[in-house]
Amino acid sequence: MARYRGSRVKVIRRLGLLPGFTSKSSNKPQNNNKQLSQYGFHLQEKQKLRYNYGISEHELIKYVKSARRKRGNSGDKLLQLLEMRLDTLLYRTGFVPTVASARQLISHGHINVNGKKVDIPGFNCSISDKIVINKEILKSLNDKNNSFSTLNCSHLVLNELNNDLTITVTNLPDIQVLGYSINILLVLEYYSGK
């Protein structure tokens, strides 16, 4: 699947701050003078979700359809599906700055899930999965980033044994605690006809 390779600051200027997309910020103020139509609001929220999680349009459609099939609030189910992706879980631990850098670590084969090497960034983790980061890459990450933090992530537990970092998924993420600036209902309305 094709990923966005263009200027990240232009996207930040257009859509606002997206912490999973980039840690950069725009020096120019966000232009709010444009009047958007109803469709424009829906499209903007959908694009925020896509860029923040680094997924393609086709992947997002599959996640929306899967969330609709599950019982409960479709918006919460959609965010839970996206938050349980392996690249997002690594980003939430705080040792990589963006979801894209987590994708790179995974695709280079530095991550093991339940004792098996996983090189698919969109791998869906489940409760009680153990994610282990290889020792060599952990040392270089420690040099760049002094501390790991699972801020707003009560569903992840970090353990460090024998220079290995183990992340355990204890339960589903609490969507209210994560704090999103994305209106998920507008995204679901955008895909209501599809």
Swiss-Prot record:
Subcellular location: Plastid, Chloroplast
Keyword Ribosomal protein on entry: yes
SMART domains: Ribosomal_S4, S4
One Pfam family it belongs to: Ribosomal_S4
Primary residence: plastid
GO cellular component, one term: chloroplast
Alphabetized GO MF terms: rRNA binding; structural constituent of ribosome
One GO BP annotation of this record: ribosomal small subunit biogenesis
Domain S4 RNA-binding residue range list: 84-144
Recorded superkingdom: Eukaryota
Keywords: Chloroplast, Plastid, Ribonucleoprotein, Ribosomal protein, RNA-binding, rRNA-binding
Complex and partners: Part of the 30S ribosomal subunit. Contacts protein S5. The interaction surface between S4 and S5 is involved in control of translational fidelity.
Family membership: Belongs to the universal ribosomal protein uS4 family.
UniProt function note: One of the primary rRNA binding proteins, it binds directly to 16S rRNA where it nucleates assembly of the body of the 30S subunit.
Protein name, per record: Small ribosomal subunit protein uS4c
Organism expressing this protein natively: Bigelowiella natans
Organism ancestry: Eukaryota, Sar, Rhizaria, Cercozoa, Chlorarachniophyceae
Primary gene name: rps4
